[in-house]
Swiss-Prot record:
Lineage: Bacteria, Pseudomonadati, Pseudomonadota, Gammaproteobacteria, Pseudomonadales
Family per record: Belongs to the AspA/AstE family. Succinylglutamate desuccinylase subfamily.
One GO MF term: zinc ion binding
Catalytic activity of the protein: N-succinyl-L-glutamate + H2O = L-glutamate + succinate
Gene3D superfamilies per UniProt: Zn peptidases
Listed CDD domains: M14_ASTE
Keyword Kinase part of the UniProt annotation: no
Protein name: Succinylglutamate desuccinylase
């Protein structure tokens, strides 16, 4: 296997390879771009016109997606996977990956779309670097652009594998992309309705990629991910890389759609979230339930039918989102 296929090993040891470019027997070119960043370019005659960005390790303790990217890269490097798409593999937060921690100083997935310019420290610098990797990768005109940012979570979930689809005014969410997600094993998709500061929101809003945050199960240490079943996703990613997907895929069978009803914003240290600490994502909340309270008698009461909560976190910094209230979506606005 080509040495550059061992990107995870290089990242874990903070090692810079002596040889920055290698070529597979099939003509695919592997190029090391910087720490945790490697581009795969197919032979020119095989190029299908897709640029695929696969990122993992934005949070350093979310290891199952990192291991998945490592398997895919090994497959390319040993010739078992024959790429027809350009692929950029990114390990988002190398320092946190080495420590097995979510982050070093602050959550890097709250520092995109310009937020890093308002901050300082290691993660702010890395967020700017990741944006630049993506900006250069997606700079070629006339090509299809797709970004999957892969995550796992400490919190349990009623729906284990789901995607978040970013928002941009005037742009419709794609039914074709949702069908692709359904085929990849996603059980639900949250259709977002406002701009965000995550990595996938940056590539969707600023770089015109189809982009998604994929939540894939529980976060566990390296080598302990047997219960995180990524078989369908891995199979689909190989088909995307090799350009062997079915044509005109449109079935959304088994895929639940949700939209954001409200975001719960923590305004002060007096904020209190009235939920059990171990509540699972997608837990249903009854109408009339007092969800949260803050200063000046600010109250969040559930008014929506079929409401569910995701990403509840009362420990976030003031001014940030402490939870999202979501409701079922009919999908009538899909493009």
């Amino acid at each position: 296997m080509l040495a550059l296929g061992k990107l995870l090993e290089l990242t874990l040891t903070a090692h810079e390879p002596a040889e920055k470019t290698q070529v597979t027997p099939g003509g695919a070119r592997l190029r090391w771009l910087g720490e945790g960043a490697l581009e795969v370019r197919p032979a020119e005659s095989e190029d299908c016109g897709l640029d695929l960005l696969l990122s993992a390790g934005i949070h350093g303790n979310e290891t199952a997606p990192i291991e998945l990217l490592e398997r895919l890269l090994h497959g390319v490097a040993n010739g078992k996977i024959k790429p027809r798409a350009r692929v950029l593999f990114l390990f988002g937060n190398p320092a946190a990956i080495r420590k097995g921690e979510r982050f070093i100083e602050q959550d890097i997935n709250r520092l995109f779309n310009g937020r890093h310019e308002l901050s300082s420290g290691f993660e702010a610098l890395r967020a700017a670097e990741l944006e630049q990797f993506a900006r250069v990768f997606f700079s070629k005109p006339g090509r299809n652009r797709l970004h999957y940012d892969l995550h796992t979570a400490i919190r349990g979930s009623k729906i284990e594998q789901f995607a978040l689809y970013p928002y941009k005014e005037g742009r419709k969410h794609s039914r074709r992309e949702l069908a692709r997600l359904a085929a990849a094993g996603m059980e639900a998709v949250l259709l977002q309705s406002k701009s965000s500061i995550t990595f996938s929101a940056f590539t969707y809003e600023q770089l015109e990629a189809e982009a998604f945050t994929l939540e894939l199960g529980k976060a566990r240490p390296f080598g302990q991910n047997e219960q995180v079943n990524l078989d369908k996703l891995e199979e689909r990613l190989i088909r995307i890389i090799e350009a062997t997907e079915p044509e005109n895929e449109s079935s959304l069978d088994g895929l639940q759609l949700f939209s954001v009803s409200r975001e719960i914003i923590k305004h002060s240290d007096s904020f209190h979230l009235h939920l059990p600490a171990d509540i699972e994502n997608f837990s249903e909340l009854s109408k009339g339930y007092l969800l949260a309270e803050d200063l000046a008698e600010m109250r969040w009461v559930v008014e929506e039918e079929g409401a569910r909560i995701i990403f509840p976190n009362p420990k976030v910094k003031n001014g940030l989102r402490a939870g999202i209230l979501i409701v079922p979506d009919s999908g009538q606005r899909l493009g």
